[in-house]
Every structure is written in structure tokens, then in C-alpha cells.
């Protein structure tokens, strides 16, 4: 019986790598997968899921107007789909998460979603909120803070490398703009207005 999975984490935990590995595992057994990623995230080029270790795969794009259930149903009529995988799933709308649950419940196709749990303010993305609420299986992918603790928060840095927690929720960027840290160092960095100073002190402990 198909299920809806949500693999969530902070940044740089290997979400895209895990997605690509899962897709490959299906394909290796002669099964067909359909991969989606957010149109808004074009850091590695549009229509592609790429990992930091160099793996990549073509992907269909979704935006807030994409009817995922209708697209996937039409595609499955043309050729059997054995699994749907969605990268950057934090950018899904509430309705799109519901549509993916319909893919599972009505089409009996497993759906694996990969995304961030919270934004740079420590607040849930809409897509993540409903995936956490409606998924059959929740899996946390772990990464670590510079101190060695589990990194569960994401700091946004300005052009001078200073952390801040105001502004638009979505600003696309990679390591130069976002850093995954533990909750303690997330709060410390915002209070001090500097992540670098905290990292330097930690090195000398």
C-alpha cells in the first residue's frame, strides 16, 4: 500500500542526495519515477535536481499554480509510475500537499517529499506544516552545527555575513547566504549579530 513520506531537515543534510539515491534504487529495478522540484529554486539550473556531491537528475517543475494530482494522473495513464519524488517540498501549498496525498490514496503511488522544516525565522514553511500533519511517515535527516550538536535551525546571513531574522521568507541562496546551526547558536548569533565571533570562540575552547 502506497504511503506519503516527508524527509525533512535543516540545510546541507543531504536531502537532494537522498532523493536521487531513492530514485536510482527504483530505476535500477526497472521501475519508473517522476521527480519534481520547485520552479523558484534555480540555483543549479531549471528543471534539475542537483546534490552538493555532484549527482543530478532531470525534474519537472512545480509552482503554486501546478495541479500535481492532475499532472501525475495524466502521466500515469500514459505510462506506469512507480514512485513520485518531490524536492524542495517546503514550497508546496496546502492544496498541493493534499493533492499528493490523493496521489497516494487514489492512484496508489508512493510519494517521497524532501524539504526544509523551518525557515530562517524558525517558523514552519506552509508545505512543511501540512506534510508534517498529513504524511504517513516522517523521517528527519540530520546534519550538525559547527559545535557538533544536531543542527535544527537555519541562519540567514546578509551580504556582510551578519545574521538576521527579518524580511521575506523566501530568498534563494546556498552556503553563502544560509548556515545550519543548533538552536543555542542560532539564538546566540542573532543576539550578538555575528556568527563568526561565536565560531572563533568555539575553536579556542
Swiss-Prot record:
Record EC number: 2.7.1.21
Parts forming coiled coils: none
Keywords: ATP-binding, Cytoplasm, DNA synthesis, Kinase, Metal-binding, Nucleotide-binding, Transferase, Zinc
Classification via InterPro entries: P-loop_NTPase (IPR027417), Thymidine_kinase (IPR001267), Thymidine_kinase_CS (IPR020633)
Protein residues bound to ATP: 9-16, 87-90
GO biological process, any: thymidine metabolic process
GO cellular component: cytosol
EC top class, as a word: transferase
Compartment(s): Cytoplasm
Top-rank lineage group of the source organism: Bacteria
Binding site for Zn(2+): 145, 147, 182, 185
Classification via Pfam families: TK (PF00265)
Entry's Gene Ontology molecular function annotations: ATP binding; thymidine kinase activity; zinc ion binding
PANTHER family found in the cross-reference section: THYMIDINE KINASE, THYMIDINE KINASE, CYTOSOLIC
NCBIfam families hit by this protein: PRK04296.1-3, PRK04296.1-5
Protein's UniProt name: Thymidine kinase
Protein's organism: Salmonella choleraesuis (strain SC-B67)
Lineage: Bacteria, Pseudomonadati, Pseudomonadota, Gammaproteobacteria, Enterobacterales
Amino acid at each position: 500500500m502506497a504511503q506519503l513520506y516527508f524527509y525533512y531537515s535543516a540545510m546541507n543534510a543531504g536531502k537532494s542526495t537522498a532523493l536521487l539515491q531513492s530514485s536510482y534504487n527504483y530505476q535500477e529495478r526497472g521501475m519508473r519515477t517522476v521527480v519534481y522540484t520547485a520552479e523558484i529554486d534555480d540555483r543549479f539550473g531549471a528543471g534539475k535536481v542537483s546534490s552538493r556531491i555532484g549527482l543530478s537528475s532531470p525534474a519537472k517543475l512545480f509552482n503554486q499554480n501546478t495541479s500535481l494530482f492532475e499532472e501525475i494522473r495524466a502521466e500515469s495513464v500514459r505510462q506506469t509510475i512507480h514512485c513520485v519524488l518531490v524536492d524542495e517540498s517546503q514550497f508546496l501549498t496546502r492544496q498541493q500537499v493534499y493533492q499528493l496525498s490523493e496521489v497516494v490514496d487514489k492512484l496508489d503511488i508512493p510519494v517521497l517529499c524532501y524539504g526544509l522544516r523551518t525557515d530562517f525565522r524558525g517558523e514552519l514553511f506552509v508545505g512543511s506544516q501540512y506534510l508534517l500533519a498529513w504524511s504517513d511517515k516522517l523521517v528527519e535527516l540530520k546534519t550538525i552545527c559547527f559545535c557538533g550538536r544536531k543542527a535544527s535551525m537555519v541562519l540567514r546571513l546578509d551580504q556582510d555575513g551578519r545574521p538576521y531574522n527579518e524580511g521575506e521568507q523566501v530568498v534563494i541562496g546556498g552556503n553563502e547566504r544560509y548556515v545550519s546551526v543548533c538552536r543555542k547558536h542560532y539564538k546566540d548569533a542573532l543576539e550578538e549579530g555575528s556568527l563568526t565571533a561565536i565560531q572563533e570562540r568555539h575553536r579556542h575552547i
